[in-house]
């Protein structure tokens, strides 16, 4: 899929009131090419992919500060490495700062550089403040919009994720490159804050302009998931598959949503076929964090449903084990832990828990390490207790923090794996103190998401163990 608008040179960026401090037209165009692929979730072969564009960009102008900001920012926003452990990434941040100090930059560019440096330190809220400062004066700065959107997602700041786009949406007129994608970005924030009708309208508008917009497809997939519209969801994914399957950075995740509908229906073999055909190959090909959490979450959900996943955890473990000490995102950590527990690797499990505990004891300004003690570690311990067959302990750990788990980020659909963990623990508990917890949780789930086959199965299970009396 080639870029639909011509790539912008120095003058075009000036005309857009987003001037870039470089005299290289080639660098400006490669910056645009990189940004376009990031927004579209697609490595465009005709442009050389994101990696190809970034290496050519650095060659075109090694001192281009915004080139460094987008390059380093994309690695950081991928959450697959940390400056503490990845010396190359640490050097990239330092180089970006040095380059920015050697030349006069616009205030907007200075804020971009500062935001990336702040994000690298793990202070996501402060980084978002800096990106928001940019958007106040430059509402059509797509890089600030996308970086802040992703960071809000990692923070579980759902209202901010929505409102950040609401504030700038009117400025994105159809003549601006990538404007239709802003509809999709806005629709996701609306969906996560339960404005389903408005979200669907915007996502469908985006798709009418560009049917290959995989992120807007993704919003619609979420809406069907949250409303338990399983038949509609399956039909939508099947009919649109040819349009989004080439968006290589998001296709795996869209297949994950497809598989969730099948798990919801109890069609486990069909779900495993999607896993084996699309999700695992994507994980093994690129090891992106989104593919990692999709793989772990799906296998864990199937296991809770009583499905044998065979040796599949052994395929995931080599990827997750490399990240046991990263502690970039607590949300990621919980999923890495699912893999080491599922693969019965106590050494990796212990390494993750010990190093996370260490990080929580000297968090500095790192928002994830600050949250580890009260939310991240209890959640991780609950996963361990579930594996060890201690359902009452799982409840003791999770019930006090269940309304704080949103702070770990991810979407409502992704975090539902933790809701299911809590319900399964409640169904298996033995303590009289907890005998009515399953009933309460299931009534709540049924009220929020009526007509869910998965909830109906859990209610039947509760009835057989006399927990609904």
Curated annotation (Swiss-Prot):
The PTM N-acetylalanine maps to 2
Name of the gene encoding the protein in the UniProt record: TTC38
Native source species: Pongo abelii (Sumatran orangutan)
> InterPro entries, per this entry?
TPR-like_helical_dom_sf (IPR011990), TTC38 (IPR033891)
Cross-referenced SUPFAM superfamilies, in alphabetical order? TPR-like (SSF48452)
Higher taxonomy = Eukaryota, Metazoa, Chordata, Craniata, Vertebrata
- Which residues are modified to Phosphoserine? 5
Keyword Chaperone belongs to the record: no
Q: Which UniProt keywords apply?
A: Acetylation, Phosphoprotein, Repeat, TPR repeat
What the entry lists under CDD domains is as follows: StaR_like (cd05804)
Which segments does the entry list as coiled coil?
none
Q: Where are the TPR repeats?
A: 108-141, 180-213, 252-285
Q: Which family does it belong to?
A: Belongs to the TTC38 family.
Q: What is this protein called?
A: Tetratricopeptide repeat protein 38
């Amino acid at each position: 899929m080639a870029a639909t608008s011509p790539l912008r040179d120095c003058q075009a960026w000036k005309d857009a009131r987003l001037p870039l401090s470089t005299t290289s037209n080639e660098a400006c165009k490669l910056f645009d090419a990189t940004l376009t692929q990031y927004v579209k979730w697609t490595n465009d072969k005709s442009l050389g992919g994101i990696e190809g564009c970034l290496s050519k960009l650095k060659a075109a102008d090694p001192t281009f500060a915004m080139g460094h900001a987008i390059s380093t920012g994309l690695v950081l926003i991928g959450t697959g490495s940390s400056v503490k452990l990845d010396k190359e990434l640490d050097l990239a941040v330092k180089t970006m700062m040095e380059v920015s100090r050697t030349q006069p930059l616009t205030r907007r560019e200075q804020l971009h550089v500062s935001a990336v440096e702040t994000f690298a330190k793990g202070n996501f809220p402060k980084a978002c403040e800096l990106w928001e400062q940019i958007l106040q004066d430059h509402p059509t700065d797509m890089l600030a919009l996308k970086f802040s959107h992703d960071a809000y997602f990692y923070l579980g700041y759902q209202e901010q994720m929505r409102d950040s786009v609401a504030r700038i949406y009117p400025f994105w007129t159809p003549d601006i490159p990538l404007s239709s994608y802003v509809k999709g970005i806005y629709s996701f924030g609306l969906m996560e804050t339960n404005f389903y009708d408005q979200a669907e309208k915007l996502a469908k508008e985006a798709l009418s302009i560009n049917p290959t917009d995989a992120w807007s497809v993704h919003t619609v997939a979420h809406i069907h998931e949250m409303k338990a519209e399983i038949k509609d969801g399956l039909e939508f994914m099947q009919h649109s598959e040819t349009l989004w399957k080439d968006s290589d950075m998001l296709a795996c995740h869209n297949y994950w949503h497809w598989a969730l509908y099948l798990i919801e229906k109890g069609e486990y073999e069909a779900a495993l076929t999607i896993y084996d055909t699309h999700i695992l190959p994507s994980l093994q090909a690129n090891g992106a964090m989104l593919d990692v959490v999709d793989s772990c979450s799906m296998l864990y959900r199937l296991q809770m449903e009583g499905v044998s996943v065979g040796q599949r955890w052994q395929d995931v473990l080599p990827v997750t084990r490399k990240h046991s000490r990263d502690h970039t995102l607590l949300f990621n950590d919980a999923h890495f832990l699912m893999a080491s527990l599922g693969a019965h690797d106590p050494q990796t499990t212990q390494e993750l828990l010990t190093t996370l505990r260490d990080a929580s004891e000297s968090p500095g300004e790192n928002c994830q390490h600050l949250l580890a003690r009260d939310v991240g570690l209890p959640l991780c311990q609950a996963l361990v207790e579930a594996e060890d067959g201690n359902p009452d302990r799982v409840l003791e750990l999770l019930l006090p923090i269940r309304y704080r788990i949103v702070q770990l980020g991810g979407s409502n659909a992704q975090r539902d794996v933790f809701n299911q963990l809590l319900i399964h623990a409640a169904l298996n508990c033995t303590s009289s103190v907890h005998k009515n917890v399953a009933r309460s949780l299931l009534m709540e789930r049924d009220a929020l998401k009526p007509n869910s086959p998965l909830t109906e199965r859990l209610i039947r299970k509760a009835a057989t163990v006399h927990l609904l009396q």
